[in-house]
C-alpha cells in the first residue's frame, strides 16, 4: 500500500509539471504564429519560410520552457524541512531526471537540425529564386550545395565535442575541486551527450554575442523610445514639403542649363538622376505621412501616450533590476568562485541579488516562478526585437560556386536586412528567427546568471549540523537545521537540475559566458547613453530610395 501511494504521489507531481508545460507549449505556438505573421511581408509572403520561422522560434521557446519544469521537479522531490519525500527514492529520482534529459536530447537535436540544415536550406532556396528564373529542381540543388557547408560545420562541432578532453587540472586537491569534478561528471561520459552539449553550447555562445549586440541595446532603447514617443506627423509632413520644394528647385536649376538644346554634362546628369530619385522618395513619404496624419489609429495612440510613458518607466525599472542582479551575480563569481578553470562555479551564496532571492520564494506558491520566468524570457525577446529593429541585421555574405577546378568565390559583401511590421522579406524573416532562436538559447544561461542557486537547485533544502549552546547547560548541543541547497551541499542531499549540467558540461564555455556578462553590462550602459542622446523617432518607418518592399499604393507601417 505504501509503495502504491508513493508511486501515485510521484505520478501526481509529474502530471502537474508536464500539464503546465503542455499549456505553455500551446501558448508558445500561438505566440510564434502571431509574431511571425505580424512582421512578414504581405506581398512576398512564402508558406515554407513562414512555417520554418514559426517552427524554429517555437522549438527554442519550448526548450526554454523546460527550464522551470526541470526546476519544479527537482524541488518537489524534497520537503521544505530538507527531507526527501517518501516517493523520491533513488530510482524514481533518476527516472524523473532522465525524463527531462530525454526532452532536452530531442529538442536540442531538432534545434541543430534547424540551425545547420533546414533554415540555411530555405534561405538559399529563396536567394536562388530571387536571382534568376531557374526551375525548382535547380533551386533545390543549389540550395543543398550551399547548405552543405553548414552541415560540415555541425559535423565538426559534434566530433570535437565527442572527443575534446574534459579533465580538470589535477593540482587542485581541495574539497571544492572534488565538488567541481562531481558536477562536470554528473551527466556521465557518453560521447553522444558530450557532442550534443558541445554543439548546443557553441550555439549558445553565438546567442550570447547576439544578446550583447541586440538585447543589451534593446533593454535601454525600448523604454526610452516609449517615454520619448515619436515626432508629430503634421510637423514631419511640413518638413517633408519643404524638402520637396528644395529638391524641385534643384531639378529646375539643372534642367534650365539645357534649355538652349545643349546636352547636360555627365556630372549634371548624375546629379539630376539623384535628385529625381530623392523626389520620388519624398513624395512616397508625403503619401505615408498624409495617411498617418488622418488615421484614427494615430489619434487613438495619442490618447494612450500617458500609458506608454508609464510602461517606459516600468521597463526602465525592470532593466535596472536585471542589470543590478547580473552585476551582483558576476561580482560574486569574481570574488568567491572556484576560478576560471571551473567556469566560475560559486560555492554558496555570498552576495545575494534580488532575483536570486525572489524566485525561490515564488516557487513556494506554484506557478508564480513559472510565470516570472516566462515574463523574463518574453522580456528578452521584446527587447531583442527592439535592438534588431533599431540596428538591423548585418551579416557577412560569401557565396561560391563549386567547379571542377575548385571553389570559385564570386560574391563577397556586407548586407543589411530591415525588420519592419508587415514589410519583412522571407530571407530577413529567417535571419530574424535564427537570431531570436540563438538569443532564447542563451536565455537559459542568462537566467542562471541572474539566479544561480535557483537554476541549480530550485527551492531544495538540506540538513546541516549546528552547535547550539543553551544557558544553564554545560557543553554544546548539536541541532540539525535546514539550509538552502547550494554548490557546497553534500552530493547525496541535493539534486542538480539537468539544465545546469547540460549547459555547464564544458567549463570553458561557462568562463566565456562569465566574460560575456560583463560585456553585456557594458553595452547596456553605452546603449542607455546613446538612447538618451538620440532624438525622437520618426512617426513612420524610414523610407529609402532602394526601398523595394514598400509599394507606392500601400502606406508604410508606422511606429507610434
Named regions from a protein language model:
Residues 2-238, 291-400, 404, 416-560:
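Extended, helix-rich structural scaffolds rather than catalytic motifs
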Residues 42, 262-272, 297-300:
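Short, surface-exposed loop/turn segments at secondary-structure junctions
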Residues 234, 241-244, 248-251, 255, ...:
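Alpha-helical coiled-coil heptad-repeat register
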Amino acid at each position: 500500500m505504501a509503495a502504491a501511494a508513493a508511486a501515485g504521489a510521484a505520478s501526481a507531481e509529474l502530471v502537474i509539471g508536464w500539464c503546465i508545460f503542455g499549456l505553455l507549449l500551446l501558448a508558445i505556438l500561438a505566440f510564434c504564429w502571431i509574431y511571425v505573421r505580424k512582421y512578414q511581408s504581405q506581398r512576398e509572403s512564402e508558406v515554407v519560410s513562414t512555417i520554418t520561422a514559426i517552427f524554429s522560434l517555437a522549438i527554442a521557446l519550448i526548450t526554454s520552457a523546460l527550464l522551470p519544469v526541470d526546476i519544479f521537479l527537482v524541488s518537489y522531490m524534497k520537503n521544505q524541512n530538507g527531507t526527501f519525500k517518501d516517493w523520491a527514492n533513488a530510482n524514481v529520482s533518476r527516472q524523473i531526471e532522465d525524463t527531462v534529459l530525454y526532452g532536452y536530447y530531442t529538442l536540442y537535436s531538432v534545434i541543430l537540425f534547424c540551425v545547420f540544415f533546414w533554415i540555411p536550406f530555405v534561405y538559399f532556396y529563396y536567394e536562388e529564386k530571387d536571382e534568376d528564373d531557374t526551375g525548382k529542381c535547380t533551386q533545390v540543388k543549389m540550395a543543398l550545395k550551399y547548405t552543405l557547408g553548414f552541415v560540415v560545420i555541425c559535423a565538426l562541432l559534434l566530433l570535437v565535442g565527442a572527443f575534446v578532453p574534459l579533465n580538470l587540472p589535477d593540482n587542485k586537491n581541495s574539497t571544492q575541486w572534488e565538488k567541481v569534478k562531481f558536477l562536470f561528471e554528473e551527466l556521465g561520459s557518453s560521447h553522444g551527450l558530450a557532442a550534443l552539449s558541445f554543439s548546443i553550447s557553441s550555439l549558445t555562445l553565438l546567442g550570447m554575442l547576439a544578446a550583447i549586440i541586440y538585447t543589451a541595446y534593446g533593454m535601454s532603447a525600448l523604454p526610452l523610445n516609449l517615454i520619448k514617443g515619436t515626432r508629430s506627423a503634421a510637423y514631419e509632413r511640413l518638413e517633408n514639403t519643404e524638402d520637396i520644394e528644395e529638391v524641385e528647385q534643384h531639378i529646375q536649376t539643372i534642367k534650365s542649363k539645357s534649355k538652349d538644346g545643349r546636352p547636360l554634362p555627365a556630372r549634371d546628369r548624375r546629379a539630376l538622376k539623384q535628385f529625381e530619385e530623392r523626389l520620388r522618395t519624398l513624395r512616397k513619404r508625403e503619401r505615408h505621412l498624409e495617411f498617418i496624419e488622418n488615421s484614427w489609429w494615430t489619434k487613438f495612440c495619442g490618447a494612450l501616450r500617458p500609458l506608454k510613458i508609464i510602461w517606459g518607466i516600468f521597463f526602465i525599472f525592470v532593466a535596472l533590476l536585471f542589470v543590478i542582479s547580473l552585476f551582483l551575480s558576476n561580482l560574486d563569481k569574481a570574488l568567491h568562485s572556484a576560478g576560471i578553470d571551473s567556469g566560475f562555479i560559486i560555492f554558496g551564496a555570498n552576495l545575494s541579488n534580488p532575483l536570486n532571492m525572489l524566485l525561490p520564494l515564488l516557487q513556494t506558491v506554484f506557478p508564480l516562478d513559472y510565470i516570472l520566468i516566462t515574463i523574463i524570457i518574453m522580456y528578452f525577446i521584446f527587447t531583442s526585437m527592439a535592438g534588431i529593429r533599431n540596428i538591423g541585421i548585418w551579416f557577412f555574405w560569401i557565396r561560391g560556386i563549386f567547379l571542377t577546378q575548385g571553389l570559385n568565390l564570386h560574391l563577397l559583401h556586407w548586407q543589411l536586412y530591415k525588420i519592419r511590421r508587415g514589410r519583412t522579406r522571407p530571407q530577413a524573416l529567417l535571419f530574424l528567427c535564427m537570431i531570436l532562436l540563438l538569443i532564447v538559447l542563451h536565455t537559459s544561461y542568462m537566467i542562471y546568471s541572474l539566479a544561480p542557486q535557483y537554476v541549480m537547485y530550485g527551492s531544495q533544502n538540506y540538513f546541516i549540523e549546528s552547535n547550539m549552546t543553551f544557558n544553564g547547560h554545560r557543553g554544546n548541543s548539536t541541532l540539525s537545521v535546514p539550509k538552502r541547497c547550494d554548490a557546497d551541499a553534500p552530493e547525496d542531499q541535493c539534486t542538480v537540475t539537468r539544465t545546469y549540467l547540460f549547459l555547464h558540461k564544458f567549463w570553458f564555455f561557462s568562463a566565456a559566458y562569465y566574460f560575456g556578462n560583463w560585456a553585456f553590462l557594458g553595452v547596456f550602459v553605452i546603449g542607455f547613453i546613446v538612447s538618451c542622446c538620440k532624438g525622437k523617432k520618426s512617426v513612420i518607418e524610414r523610407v529609402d530610395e532602394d526601398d523595394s518592399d514598400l509599394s507606392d499604393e500601400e502606406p508604410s507601417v508606422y511606429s507610434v
